[in-house]
Every structure is written in C-alpha cells, then in structure tokens.
Amino acid sequence: MFRFFVIKKWLLWSWIGSFVILTSLWVQVKIDVEINKWFGEFYDMIQKALSKPNSITIEEYWESLFSFISLAGLYVSVYVIISFFTAHFLFRWRAAMVEWYHSVYERASKIEGAAQRVQEDTIKFSRIMESLGTSLIESIMVLIQFIPILLGLSVGIPIFFFGDWQYGLISGALIWTLGGTIFLIALGWILRLVGVEYDLQKKEAAYRKVLVLGEDNLEKTNPTIVNNLYDGVRKIHYKMYFHYLYFNAAKWSYLQGMVIVPYIALAPTIITGAVTLGFVQQISRAFGRVESSLQYLVRSWPIIVELISVRRRLLEFERQIEINDNR
C-alpha cells in the first residue's frame, strides 16, 4: 500500500506532493488564527456600537466586514486549490498500488475477491485518505496554533472549577474530550464495529462473486446458494445497524454536550462581566477549535473503522499473493 513512497517513478509526486499539501494546510490554519482574532475585534466593535450609539463610524463597520471577506476569500482559494491537488495526489497513490496489483494479477486472480481488492478497495482507500488524512494533519496543526492562543487568553480570568489557574481551559478541554474519546473507543471495541465492518465486506464479496460467475454461466448461479448468501448479507447489515444505533446515540449525545462546555467553563467570568463580548467570542471559538481537533477520533470513527477494514483486506490480499508466489 505504501510503495508509492519508495518507487522511483512516484517519488516526485509522493514526497514533493506531501510537502505541498502540508504547507497549504499550515497556511489554512494560520488564516484561521487570523479569522479568530477578527471575531474578537468585530464583536468588541458590535458591543461598543450597541452600548453607545454612534460610537463607531459606518466606514469602520464596512472596513471590518471587508477584512473578513478578504480573509475568507483567501481561505476558500487555498482550500479549493489544495483539494484539487490532493485529489490528484491520492489518485497517483492509488495508481501506484494498482500498477503493482496489475503486474501480479495473473497469480492474484485466483484469490477470492481479487477484482474487488484491486478496483473497489483501492479507490476506497484513496477517497478515505483524502478526507481522513488531511483532517488528521489539520487537527494536529490546529492544536499547535490554538493551544498557545487559548493559554494566552485564559490568563487572569476565573474558570469554573479550576479558578484562576492558567491551564484551566486547556485542562477542561482535555478532560472532557479525551474522556469522551476513550469512552467511545471502548464502546466501539465492545460493539466490535471494525469486526462487523470486515465481516460485512466478506459477505458482500462472496455474494458478488456468485452473481458475477452467473453472468457467464447461469448454471453456476444456484438460486438456493444465492438466496443463502443474500440472507447472510442481510443479517450482517442488520447487525451493523443495531451496533451503530448504540454508538451513534452515545456519540451525538456527547458531541451536543460539547456545545455548552466553553460557556460552562467561562461562567464565573461572564457572570462578573470581567470580559467583553468580543473576548468571549474569541476564547469560545479558540476553545471550540481545540475541542474539535481533540475530538478527531470521535468525529471520524465510522470512517476510521472503514479504513481499518480496507487496510486489513488489502494486507490479507497481498499476503495471499506472497503465499501463492512461494508455492
């Protein structure tokens, strides 16, 4: 799966492409930091205007809005361009995988589900990596940028439960997000989400194989066998829906609770009127960005489960090819 980074033909795309993607993601995060700063200044201006009529000019108001438009426009431009580039980058990654599979397909074609591995799983791998990989890197970069901002903003203000401790906001975010993440990972393990996804793909592959064989020779498509295979597919799908019912109930209850966490943390500060509206917006947004990054596993868990399942199938496929070569 990772020959893309060692094959000479793809070295330029793999390494230079990775550098371009990482650099652009870093630029996006830096723009996000500036947008967060803008929110603080804009809401302070709004508070000033509402508390004292005509305390700001219409020119100052429009200038602030145009400042946001320029930042948002730059962010969108970078995002669109790098999304286009990332799609090409990951298709090249898929091409590197597929080319190797093509070179050994004469030996691999006898392995059950070989066609699905080469065509379907490689495209799944590239599409999942496009969303999952970039969001992971961006989450790490957001933490690097926003944790110092959150620490700076929390100096000298009282935080619920932690008091005036400088690291109160960060500690609260870590306790809530990591605690929830660990709980949901444990729940996913108890519910065997990865195992169920893997079993589902195996059942679907067996069912598809019989149908494909039947296209060329109807005698090989015994109605009893087809019905039994589809019955297995139906049962594993129902099992997966049932397991995700519990997981989604826990996941979305937790994520909805996260909405009010920054306001709970800032309750003593807000009640005493120790800060401005702009400060509250700036700190709650920074808190939310840190929370969102720490919740990467929670928000991406279903996709992570699918990626693990795809990787497991591809590794098993490559292992079967090696076994056939050694015979």
Residue ranges and their predicted role:
Residues 15-31, 35, 66-78, 135-151, ...:
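Hydrophobic alpha-helical transmembrane segments of multi-pass integral membrane proteins
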Residues 1-35, 41-68, 82, 86, ...:
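Membrane-integrated ABC transporters
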